[in-house]
């Protein structure tokens, strides 16, 4: 998300402060903004050394560029240098909230007075909290109320995420991707996600037997990596579906538009699992951008990504029978799939896109940023 901000904020109006990684220089060349990288790998910014280096570097950057507002792409670790800039330079900051980090934070502030104090210093001192879905916003309000930050809770803003309709679009030739990933025959269901329990891939595998009873030959492609692949593959074999479920592994972003176009239906049956949940469901709007009808789990922030009865169907993600029923309904009705897919594409063109997201964020930061310094005479 922060990369999209850096690409789409008006040129020279934003300075990006972040960690280093191999190949960063080539990546930074695409941005119209100044990108200032701390001399520490991004994966190490959460360490004490990383936080100290980032905070010092951000302070030096602030003295040079005189920022009027700071966006934190996540509460931790970005909240630490942002809080320091507020204390030392009076720069207000906004925090973008996704969901899972708030579930974890809520659990911690119940157990630890120190965690509550830290949360008040980082989250509670923000000028504004922006949530990526209504579900995330509700969770943010709950956490803020528990921290005694009622005014901030009342001001939580909701900015649903988007995608890039120029990249994800209908009509991309899928033949090469079909051949490369072995997606012959069909119909094909598709999920693009990390292989974790809260993504609901296991529930879709369980639903697949009921789908194949009504629509023989239906198969399920899963693009992504994660720790649960062995268990998910074993589940498919145990259910006699080993040949019907294809794990594609990591799929390059360049291949994703063709992969979506190779599928007949997208399924994103995410659900709450322990302290993990789906804050929005960006792959659902990527699928919509490609003209695919979608089946989404009625859980977390997914209802903000799927317009039930317009761009797809929402189902109970904890019930494989409900997932199967939603899939069967759409596989049985090509006209309905086409209507949902076309509506999804329109929704991306008019709302679920990064240009709209950035406009919303510019509008929000304009309400909190410091006044512009007087013009030099």
What are the residue ranges of the model-derived segments?
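N-terminal subdomain of nucleotide-sugar transferases
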Residues: 1-39, 372
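A short, active-site helix/loop in glycosyltransferases that binds the activated sugar's phosphate group
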Residues: 20-22, 124-158, 163-168
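Nucleotide-sugar donor phosphate/pyrophosphate-binding loop at the beta->alpha transition
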Residues: 50-53, 89-94, 102-125, 138-141, ...
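Conserved donor-binding/catalytic core segment of Leloir-type glycosyltransferases
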Residues: 130, 183-199, 205-208
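Nucleotide-activated donor-binding/catalytic signature segment of Leloir-type glycosyltransferases, i.e.
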Residues: 230-255
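Acidic donor-binding loop of glycosyltransferase active sites
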Residues: 244, 261-276, 292
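Short hydrophobic beta-strand element within catalytic cores of glycosyltransferases
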Residues: 284, 289, 293-296, 306
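Conserved acidic donor-binding segment of nucleotide-sugar-dependent glycosyltransferases
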Residues: 307-309, 313-320, 329-335
